[in-house]
Amino acid sequence: MNPTLELACELIRRNSTTPDDAGCQELMIARLERIGFTVERMRFGEVDNFWARRGSDSPTLCFAGHTDVVPTGPLTAWHSDPFEPVERDGHLFGRGAADMKASLAAFVTAIEDFVAGHPDHKGSIALLVTSDEEGVAVHGTRAVVETLAARGETFDWCIVGEPTSARQFGDTIKNGRRGSLSGKLTVKGVQGHIAYPHLARNPVHLLAPALAELAAIRWDEGNAHFPPTSWQVSNIHGGTGATNIIPGTVEVQFNFRFSTEQTADGLKNAVHSLLDRHGLDYELEWNLSGNPFLTATGDLIAAIETAVKDVTGIMPELNTSGGTSDGRFIKDVCREVVEFGPLNATIHKVNECVAVEDVPKLSEIYRRTLASLLAR
């Protein structure tokens, strides 16, 4: 079996449902230490992380990823045990196959192959791996980055191994992500009998015009790299469940996905201004999951674009679509951040899989990128 596929299978066999690492990181660490990496284990709360580095000079290329996976869902819906990798119809099945144990395996084998051919490479190679990406993402990459930043440690380039390919392997490199800002809004009224509305104040009715106005706003037009900022309601709850009671409060949860045309503070101020103008009695809690980031050009994009084209024959598209990733934290200590990995069609689904032929190709793309940036 191909070495990258073999390692991917070993990782899939470990039930690393978030935030449990289940020994995946120690498997990777053992191989990295054999080729000269210094490894720093960083455990925060129940989360395992490690920061590994080979070399002490600049420039530094970092590979970043996560060993944790999402829950399997109903086992009866799987064709086979989700933690027993199975090869069928040209695909490797198992939870985490695409998101992102194939990428983790490809990181390791690409580095092993590169170091074997270039033991005295330029600069440094690093890995940042966490078991807290699919969960709350507080004690994972964010905490590691904060530790690195506190001691003044930065790096030049980072490849996050997220499954970015959309229709065929190699078609997409993510060179940025939108920011994510969520709000939990509680509007207060006066509860009462539904037959006596003059003795109550219905907060749903009070809020409705403000919600309609928020939904109609064109926040910006986007730009060459990002689509327009989006505001969406995710949940609304009000009332006791009874049909004869006017509720005393209504709670609305919403989310902004915002481009570099906006700032979190600017969006917050706009929402507060609108709610105040409508005269609402409200409380509003905010949660900023991450600011937008963008790597428009640079040596890393040039290197990985060339590697993808040489291995797959496809010139990849650069885009910033999709949800957030740990790149939102890494950007604080890294000059250029991109994401590249296998097809994402089955991630978080039952019968998650990755094409068998794509796994060694992924390793070769990472190896060629390393060679382009760090070979002497």
Swiss-Prot record:
Key word NADP present: no
Catalytic activity: N-succinyl-(2S,6S)-2,6-diaminopimelate + H2O = (2S,6S)-2,6-diaminopimelate + succinate
Family matches, as Pfam families: M20_dimer, Peptidase_M20
Biological processes, Gene Ontology terms: diaminopimelate biosynthetic process; L-arginine biosynthetic process; lysine biosynthetic process via diaminopimelate
Functional summary from the UniProt entry: Catalyzes the hydrolysis of N-succinyl-L,L-diaminopimelic acid (SDAP), forming succinate and LL-2,6-diaminopimelate (DAP), an intermediate involved in the bacterial biosynthesis of lysine and meso-diaminopimelic acid, an essential component of bacterial cell walls.
Family, similarity comment: Belongs to the peptidase M20A family. DapE subfamily.
Subunit structure: Homodimer.
Protein name, entry field: Succinyl-diaminopimelate desuccinylase
Organism for this UniProt entry: Laribacter hongkongensis (strain HLHK9)
Gene: dapE
